[in-house]
From Swiss-Prot:
Residues given in the record as Zn(2+) binding sites: H174, H176, D187
Protein name listed in UniProt: UPF0758 protein BCB4264_A4572
Organism field: Bacillus cereus (strain B4264)
InterPro entries named in the record: MPN, RadC_JAB, RuvA_2-like, UPF0758, UPF0758_CS, UPF0758_N
Entry-linked Pfam families: RadC, UPF0758_N
UniProt domain MPN: residue ranges: 103-225
Domain of life: Bacteria
Family, as annotated: Belongs to the UPF0758 family.
GO molecular function: metal ion binding; metallopeptidase activity
Chain location of the short sequence motif JAMM motif per the record: 174-187
Gene3D superfamilies in the cross-refs: Cytidine Deaminase, domain 2
GO biological process: proteolysis
TM regions (residue ranges): none
Amino acid sequence: MNGIRDVVREEQPRERLLLEGAGSLSNRELLAVLLRTGSKEETVLKLSDKILHQFDGLRMLKDATLEELISIHGIGISKASQLMAAFELGRRMVRLEYQNRYSIRSPEDCAKYMMEEMRFLQQEHFVCLYLNTKNQVIHRQTIFIGSLNTSIVHPREVFKEAFRRAAASIICLHNHPSGDPTPSREDIAVTKRLVECGQIIGIEVLDHIIIGDHKFVSLKEKGHI
């Protein structure tokens, strides 16, 4: 009887959540709670397994489109919408933790502030953090999306927002979708150009952080600033 009870318990993730807390559930079980029901052909846990397999786990699932989700047999508009809403809430909660005038004292602080948001992006995003005199983030702006080079990253776009926000300094960041944050020659060239412009204008570019997968490189620490 105990064996049967254990099997039933494993097949009831919502009940496990209520008894043991959400932290005790696996990824497939949490997904099953969001989906609520399976299909005529398979249980909700089997459907969860299929989704995780399709997207190679959570890494790619978080950026799944509506079309990609409903292409999976057993997932309709309703289930796909529930999943996408849950993923977006998760992203917003991560941002909330750091939104209230987050202070940056080191490259590690900066990487921590943006890592979870940027490390899974499938295209390069060039982002600027605008700081006040206390090194607190007063604004964040995505300057452009695409491969980084000196012809695309124009200082005018970077510093225009700094003037609008009365920023004292800027930290630039961009991600490498490959997961490897090693700076390229273009990364270094863009950084030096922005630093030079900042010196002329009087708004210091403090650092340029390259985000990889759970790792980062500070161009200031590498001696390029």
